[in-house]
Amino acid sequence: TAYNHRFEPHFLRMKDLIESGELGEIYFMRMFYGNGTARDVRNSEWRDTGAGVLPDLGSHLIDTVLFFFGDTNREFRPVVFNRFENRAFDRFIISSTGTPEIELEMTLLSWRNHFTCDVFTENGSAHIDSLCKWGPSTFTRRTRVLPSGRPPEESIVLTQSDPTWELEYTHFKSLCETGVVNLDKDVTINRALASVANATDLD
């Protein structure tokens, strides 16, 4: 399965920062992923079924959690799920306890496409605002001031075309050439989505 967001420059930057240990203990992370396709989905009989936005956008968010933290044993639960304009869910919030705590929100009702990621930690915070395809995309790191105060921050702003598909395709070709295949990620994502969907009873 192609989860191309892993190749977003700021996703790679966030992963490197998390793995560096410079942030200290990671307390919690929240992500929002929204687009404005509710009417398109409603007009498509095969798309406006089942768990709706959950597998559509939620799969990318859960994959991002795996990419950042590599935790395949994490369990998610539904917090909020709505059908504002669609037969299937057009808004979902799911969460996961543990370290760090995770909150993921996805919707088809964000009329301007948008993505955010906020990581709050012992030594500060790190933030992604938007994706390259919707640009500009900004990565911001804030360093905590003790005992309190406005933190100094450093930002990197990218205005460019979406580089992820070409990078993902190059990665795919390298896997084909080496014969290395691992379905653990896909199994984990599908299991998490099914568990959340089943907890809503869908009907």
Model regions: which residues?
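Predominantly a Rossmann-like dinucleotide-binding segment in NAD(P)-dependent oxidoreductases
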Residues: 5-76, 82
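Alpha-helical elements of Rossmann-like donor-binding domains used by nucleotide-donor carbohydrate transfer enzymes
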Residues: 9, 13-17, 64, 93, ...
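Short glycine/proline- and acidic residue-enriched helix-loop micro-motifs
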Residues: 48, 150-157
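Contiguous beta-strand/loop segments that form the cofactor/metal-binding neighborhood of enzyme cores
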Residues: 62-135, 166, 170-179
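C-terminal helix-rich "cap/oligomerization" subdomain common to oxidoreductases
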Residues: 97, 170-203
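Short polybasic amphipathic segments
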Residues: 117-119, 134-149
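Active-site loop of classical SDR/Rossmann-like NAD(P)-dependent oxidoreductases
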Residues: 156-170
